[in-house]
Every structure is written in structure tokens, then in C-alpha cells.
Regions:
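N-terminal active-site segment of His-dependent metallophosphoesterases
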Residues: 1-58, 148-149
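Active-site-proximal beta-strand elements of phosphoester/diester hydrolases
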Residues: 1-13, 123-132, 155-157, 217-224, ...
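Divalent metal-coordination and catalytic microenvironments
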Residues: 8, 41, 46, 61, ...
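Active-site environment of divalent metal-dependent phosphoester hydrolases
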Residues: 12-15, 49-53, 74-86, 115-117, ...
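Short, flexible/disordered intra-domain loops and linkers
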Residues: 14-22, 54, 84-98, 167-179
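His/acidic metal-ligating clusters that form di-metal
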Residues: 29-41, 125-127, 134-218, 268-281
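Extended active-site neighborhood of metal-dependent phosphoesterases/phosphodiesterases
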Residues: 56-148, 215-218, 234
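Binuclear metal-dependent phosphoesterase catalytic core
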Residues: 208-281
Length: 281
């Protein structure tokens, strides 16, 4: 079983406001992504930069994903589904908060009205979710019920890392604490109580990282395919575990160097063991 993990595309129509040339770069990624031969592609959020306030950008992201002709499961990030009224007030264009049920948000209308999605792949389950601060959509109890209903190994797909990926942080908003602090803590507690959750696949921080979440679960981030560090993950799953590898995309190889030019390439692209290895379950 092969799973392709991409994240943080940050799609916006050309000519792009944030990163000129981004869509051309993403289009150069199309053929390499198809050649992976994935049974499923997971997309761990921030499909857009301005989608929370400009739903037509979400439609463009869906068009791009559909055009790959690879089965996929996508979840929203903070730029697709504003995480809280506070974030919406701080960033009304990039993280607009929609005080409506999930299914009536721009993301829900574009990608599906259910914030929890399941794909059954033989002896493996893939569960994706979109979450907002204080869980107005009731995602956490749904997840608990879904995870408890089956004993097969689970790859859980969300947007926000639940434990730090780099220390020290290059910026106060590096990580999830500024976005979903209470809900993130509750989600981490939930995962630690569910021994069948073997991998938590996420994005958000634009780095390639691997961190333990619990004795039974590992957190893996993919870089930002669109804005950098432009990487994607390939997971080969068998009955005893998962082998992970990392490939470079066509976009920039770094993102946080604009904040701190002294950051190493390893900060963005990960160590050797973060880029490839095996997880046993």
C-alpha cells in the first residue's frame, strides 16, 4: 500500500500576490506526483493562502488536485478554514473566521460537508479531519468514536502539529499554539489514548520533521509543496509498519530563512532520519 503525503500548497490564481510563480511551480510537480503511483494521496491543509475569505481560491485548489487524477483525502488548514474569531480578527483576509457550521463554510461547500472522513484501505484506515478552536463542529467526539470502532492501524491526517517540530522556534507562530491551543491539547490527549493511531500526518510548519507523539504514534510533517520547504512524503505500508521517504518538489527549498537567514538547510529539509526511515507497529 502506497500513500503520498503533500501539504501546504498555498494555491492562489496567477499572477500570485504572495509568491510569484507558485502555480507554475506546482504545475511542474504534477507529473512527479503522478509517477509515485499512490493508492491514496493525503493533503494536510493550507491548500490555499486566501481561501478562507476567497472561496474561489478553494475551487482552484480542488481543480488542481482533481487534475492529478490520484485518489485523495484533503483536510483544511488555517488559511482554508479560519481557526478562531481571534485569528480572524488578526488576519481577516488569510484566516477569516466563518461563524457557521462546518458544512456551510467555504471549505465545506467546496470539499465536502463532513469534517471527519475515513478511507478504508484493506488492513489500514486513513482518517482525516478539519478542526477549529474549541471544536464548534464536534470533531473530537466524532474522532473518538471513529477511532474506537475499529482496531486496524490508523493514519490520522490533520493540519496542525501537536508537539514541537523545532526548538527553538524561529517565530512565535511556528507551531499550533497560536492557532488551536486548547483543541490541539485535547486532540493530543485523544491520540495518546488510542493505541491504533500509528501515524499522525500533518503540515503547517513548512518543514520536514518526525517526532514521537506517544509510544504507539509518530508525528510526521511534510514541507510546503508550494511555498517551501518544497517536499513531499511517500509512505509504503505493510503488515508490520511503514517505510517513509521524502522527495523534493519544484518550489523553494526553504521558507523560514526569510525570518532568520542563518537557519540551516537541515532546519527546513530535516535530518537524514527525518527524511527517510521505518516505523514499526
Amino acid at each position: 500500500m502506497r500513500i503520498l503525503h503533500i501539504s501546504d500548497l498555498h494555491v492562489e490564481p496567477a499572477p500570485e500576490e504572495r509568491l510569484p510563480g507558485l502555480m507554475a511551480s506546482l504545475d511542474r510537480d504534477r507529473d512527479p506526483l503522478r509517477r509515485v503511483g499512490a493508492d491514496l494521496m493525503i493533503v494536510s491543509g493550507d491548500l490555499t493562502t486566501y481561501g478562507s475569505s476567497r472561496p474561489e481560491h478553494l475551487a482552484l485548489a480542488r481543480e488542481w488536485l482533481d487534475g492529478l487524477d490520484v485518489p485523495y483525502l484533503a483536510v483544511p488548514g488555517n488559511h482554508d478554514l479560519g481557526p478562531s474569531p481571534d485569528r480572524g480578527a488578526r488576519s481577516p483576509v488569510q484566516e477569516a473566521y466563518e461563524d457557521v457550521p462546518y458544512g456551510r463554510t467555504g471549505y465545506g461547500r467546496t470539499f465536502g460537508t463532513d469534517p471527519v472522513e475515513v478511507r478504508d484501505l484493506g488492513q489500514l484506515r486513513v482518517v482525516g479531519f478539519g478542526v477549529r478552536e474549541d471544536d464548534p463542529d464536534g470533531v473530537l467526539p466524532r474522532l473518538a468514536e471513529t477511532l474506537a470502532a475499529d482496531t486496524r492501524p490508523v493514519i490520522l491526517v490533520g493540519h496542525y502539529p501537536l508537539v514541537p517540530t523545532r526548538d527553538p522556534k524561529p517565530h512565535e507562530e511556528f507551531g499550533s499554539e497560536a492557532f488551536v491551543p486548547r483543541t490541539g491539547a485535547a486532540l493530543l490527549d485523544l491520540i495518546r489514548r488510542q493505541p491504533n493511531v500509528r501515524l499522525y500526518a500533518c503540515g503547517h510548519v513548512h518543514v520536514t520533521s518526525v517526532r514521537p507523539l506517544a509510544p504507539h504514534c509518530t508525528q510526521v510533517t511534510a514541507g510546503s509543496l508550494g511555498q517551501g520547504a518544497s517536499t513531499y512524503r511517500v509512505y509504503d505500508v505493510d503488515s508490520s509498519g511503514l517505510t517513509y521517504a521524502t522527495a523534493l518538489g519544484a518550489g523553494p527549498l526553504g521558507f523560514w530563512h526569510t525570518v532568520d537567514p542563518n537557519l540551516s538547510g537541515e532546519f527546513s529539509l530535516g535530518t537524514g532520519t527525518e527524511r527517510s526511515g521505518r516505523l514499526i507497529w
